[in-house]
Amino acid sequence: MTEKIISEIILDLVFQCNDFSQFSNKLKDTKSKLIFESIFWEKVFLSWINIILKKKDYELPNYISEKKSFSLGLRIISNQEIASLNKKWMQKNGPTDVLSFPIISDESLNNLDHIELGDIFISLEMALEQSYEYKHTIYREMIWLASHGFLHLLGWEHNNENDLENMLNLQEYLITRLD
């Protein structure tokens, strides 16, 4: 992770991962096994927060851009669990790859010192399928999905093609800064 990290930033990450030992034979490289480590994700999200806060060409709500303390949740779950969340909260049937549930949405948060961003849920099974489909590693796919969910927590949306292209470009930028 080559970005210089702003030392004042504090991140409280709540990380949970189901037991996916049945997939261990599909995770042959050392880098892919990092996706099950809390400390790995903490470094990733800290790096991304620093990048976003330092780059002035990304519009952030004031209640994010002026803060130094954040928390978020990341859960790696099964297709069954994400399908249930997808049905309950998005009114869509079946599993999806990533769901984000932002907590921040109100300017009244300006007075808070610590900002709870929300929660990201990633289906490992969908990520594995997509990594095969797109011919890249599960590590790459999980980072891609996490970056997508993270940007949603910060308020990015993709309601049209231009917004989607901008969001995907920012995801790629964030990911390339990790290597």
UniProtKB/Swiss-Prot annotation:
So where does Zn(2+) get bound?
A: 148, 152, 158
What cofactor does this protein call for?
Zn(2+)
Source organism, top-level taxon = Bacteria
Q: Does the keyword Hydrolase apply?
A: yes
Q: Name one GO cellular component term.
A: cytoplasm
A GO biological process held by the record: rRNA processing
Q: What Gene3D superfamilies has UniProt attached to this entry?
A: Metalloproteases ('zincins'), catalytic domain (3.40.390.30)
Role? Single strand-specific metallo-endoribonuclease involved in late-stage 70S ribosome quality control and in maturation of the 3' terminus of the 16S rRNA.
**Sequence similarity:** Belongs to the endoribonuclease YbeY family.
Q: Which HAMAP family match?
A: Endoribonucl_YbeY
Name this protein carries in UniProt: Endoribonuclease YbeY
Q: Organism, per UniProt?
A: Prochlorococcus marinus (strain MIT 9215)
Which gene specifies this protein's sequence? ybeY
